[in-house]
Amino acid sequence: MVPADATTWWALADNGYAWRTNSADFQLVLYRIDPRWGDPGGPTVQETVVLRDPDRRIPWTIVCDPPHGSRLPGLGFNALPPSPPACGDDPAARILTGFDLDPESFVRLPDGTFWVGEEFGPFLVHVAADGRVLEPPVGVPGVRSPQNPFLAISDRARAEAPTVAASRGFEGVAISPNGSTLYALLEGAVAGDDPQDLRIYVFDVARRSFADHYLTLRLELPSQQVNLASLMDASGAPVYPAAVAPPAGPVSIGELKAVNDRELLVIERDNHGDDLAAPRFKKIFLLDLPQAPEHGGRVGKTPLLDLLAVPDPDGVGGDGDFFRLPFYTIESVHMVDERTLLVA
């Protein structure tokens, strides 16, 4: 989420129904929402912006290209109706679907346009305030997922093996305060890298190009099991009464957000929660960018907040002295002011 104005926020929908192959009928959208903090009626959607490509900036066939086919593998378009509902009534709009792109992160520029980080390429995609794609998606040289569309339409690309796993693209994108630089964080390690190291690519907005160097985020691999007795609801009952803390395993990132010119926030989380298994690792870290970056150099890293043990001395959350956010995917953080974070 990123702020739209004093009371509303922009939020980005994922690619649809969890999988590429079942998301061809899901429109990609940005929502402007009013959280209405404390209102029992809950948040309201103030505006919906549908992502589309009427100017044909995307150089491969998309779902909403009549006759609604695609050269991308993995989807039988003969199963789609003659006019897929996601494509709307205007074929020229070329509405984008969850089969075309997998948006995972975004930033808003001072001019009101958006840069969206996605995972199929992975690509950075420049989008106007009204949802139009403004220019061809930008990929990192040498970084390709198995779902990269050029693997299907380019003989040269087809001869090159994917270098990052599926669904491990630009999960986090941050923008510098002056709007000149994007920091794009992969969710998975590039082939040949240490699996615990993720690359942060530096993108020059004016030049529309990635820097020759990248930075490295060293992921945590927590080995300590969570104390299940500490995961209690307001009545004292265990939150996960039948769960067993999982062994040490993979950690994912959920968001990257700039604090200032030198510092970033990142969410790291395990893949547990939502009644799967007891979550034991959901944290926000403060990253320190090197003043003289070296190719592959690691960013500094300081623990900032444990989302399974947020101090709650006033009992606002109703869980006692600590509030816990034990959800499987925690995917947004924003620094509202010097003492306040928004986490979603």
Predicted segments, located by residue:
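Sequence/structural signature of beta-propeller domains
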Residues: 1-344
